[in-house]
Amino acid sequence: MDASLSPFDHQKTQNTEPKKSFITSLITLRSNNIKEDTYFVSELKPTEQKSLQELKEKLSASSSKASSMWGVSLLGGDDKADVILLKFLRARDFKVADSLRMLEKCLEWREEFKAEKLTEEDLGFKDLEGKVAYMRGYDKEGHPVCYNAYGVFKEKEMYERVFGDEEKLNKFLRWRVQVLERGVKMLHFKPGGVNSIIQVTDLKDMPKRELRVASNQILSLFQDNYPELVATKIFINVPWYFSVIYSMFSPFLTQRTKSKFVMSKEGNAAETLYKFIRPEDIPVQYGGLSRPTDSQNGPPKPASEFSIKGGEKVNIQIEGIEGGATITWDIVVGGWDLEYSAEFVPNAEESYAIVVEKPKKMKATDEAVCNSFTTVEAGKLILSVDNTLSRKKKVAAYRYTVRKSTTTV
């Protein structure tokens, strides 16, 4: 049964560079352009095509031992090699000498860091996966999404355990690079394909001063060795002071760079993320339906999106459920703060409606509801979300599956 077929019942009621903080580093980190950079060599300007050819020739004549990256031979002369070389050229405005220098340093770093084998290592940060930095799903354009959230480090014990000394810090840096390497492996590296990731950074409870050293090292590593790999940076739960800092830096950023920053104030994470990412790919803590264990069951089941206006109640009716069938559903409203309930209404007129979930006031921090119900007779399930006490419009999503009874008489 297709969830999208269910009807809705709407009821209105300068040169010297100062020491950068984590925030300023995030703002000034360069990103590429999803729409413009398709990597078709035929679409490059003649001067850019010439720069690409010169870089190939200089790299071939270079003394650099390593000439492959992410499993792609840079001297192979194929489309994948061109995509990677163009990333380094764009990072240095197509200046061949600067691009070659950057590329050679990156190749040396990858060899010393053993980056090619990094994704297979167990670095002992299982408890941070899915919390601090992790790849989860794709955006609506097919870009892998990397989530970052450093709020857990506001607790001194956690901070000391991860960043307590230089050895611990270096191990964390290696793990953070590992997360990005896993994201890079999800890219196509071909003209017209998906050649960059989306980065979502949650600024809630982020300890700014304490993370300065670690964050600056991470961002330096990424900027030096992963050029043009981040297409869009989405900042969620943005505190007021971040917006002030951004407004100060904004005049010095190019329009192209500014177009790739998305700022979302506290409480608007779901509303912002729904514009770029499908709800089944958004983590439950941000108003989506994705849980860490979902990937074990294959691709996520698509969800249907809807919105609830302020002063409105919405009833989602899932009809055509046979007797003895089991219906399982997920439903979420971004920043809930409203009342939710569920009931089953039999088709037979003499039967009574069954309360499946009593009306419950959902808190703003509540995650998606997942529940199931086995019917005795045919009927429909009604999921109700009551936003009549709020003036704020909210985004929401739901999905369901119906499993028919296998019992035979």
Curated annotation (Swiss-Prot):
Its membrane topology is listed as: Peripheral membrane protein
Main location group: membrane
Q: Which residues form a coiled coil?
A: none
Pfam families for this protein: CRAL_TRIO, CRAL_TRIO_N, GOLD_PATL1_C
Q: Which domain of life is it from?
A: Eukaryota
Biological process (GO) annotations held by this record are: cell division; cellular response to auxin stimulus; protein localization involved in auxin polar transport
- Protein name, UniProt field: Patellin-6
